[in-house]
């Protein structure tokens, strides 16, 4: 299915890191998404060093306080994990996509030949990541989240992508209009302002 096909809402089910590093749990989540009618599932490829400094601080969890860096380290999995997930997505009849948070995770994601590359809102101003995504993704659709972003930041991100695409083609770029208020009032969506393919983010 074409992610930009008109007349059909394209449903991406967020798995993120909810698998907890267990392939068996990932299988269950993929199966559940497929059974619910999702077109695609999305994971997060996490490397702690791409996201935060080791001395960022602590987070309070049910088991007590833990270093935030250590928590992100726990979310790291082997490269083979996502190859297996992608293969299982194919078996279940859903597409595979993921969010990278830095250049290492991006390169690994591109090697997986995903259905799409989803850039998370905090990475909207990560211009080196956007530039490499545009240059190396070729025909892979790019979904760009825009939560808590100013219009000038969105324009700069799109300009960075366009400048780094060899063919300057923006037909397979979509903005994920992410109003960071869950759930967001309809009066705050302002969707008519956007003139490229738009997605909405519900939590």
Question: What residue spans do the PLM features occupy?
Answer:
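Catalytic cores and adjacent flexible loops of soluble metabolic enzymes
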Residues: 1-203
């Amino acid at each position: 299915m074409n992610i930009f096909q008109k007349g059909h809402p394209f449903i991406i089910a967020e798995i993120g890191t909810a698998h907890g590093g267990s392939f068996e749990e990932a299988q269950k989540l993929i199966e559940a998404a497929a059974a619910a009618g999702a077109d695609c599932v999305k994971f997060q490829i996490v490397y702690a060093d791409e996201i935060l400094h080791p001395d960022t601080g602590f987070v309070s969890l049910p088991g007590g306080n833990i270093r935030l860096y250590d928590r992100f380290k726990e979310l790291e999995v082997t490269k083979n994990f996502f190859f297996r997930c992608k293969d299982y997505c194919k078996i279940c009849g859903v597409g595979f996509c993921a969010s990278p948070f830095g250049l290492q995770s991006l390169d690994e994601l591109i090697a997986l030949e995903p259905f799409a590359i989803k850039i998370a809102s905090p990475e909207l101003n990560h211009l080196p990541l956007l530039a490499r995504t545009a240059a190396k993704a070729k025909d892979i659709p790019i979904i760009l989240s825009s939560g808590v972003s100013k219009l000038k930041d969105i324009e700069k991100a799109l300009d960075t992508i366009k400048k780094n695409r060899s063919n300057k083609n923006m037909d397979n770029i979509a903005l994920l209009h992410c109003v960071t208020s869950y759930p967001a009032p309809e009066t705050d969506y302002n969707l008519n302002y956007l003139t490229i393919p738009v997605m909405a983010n519900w939590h």
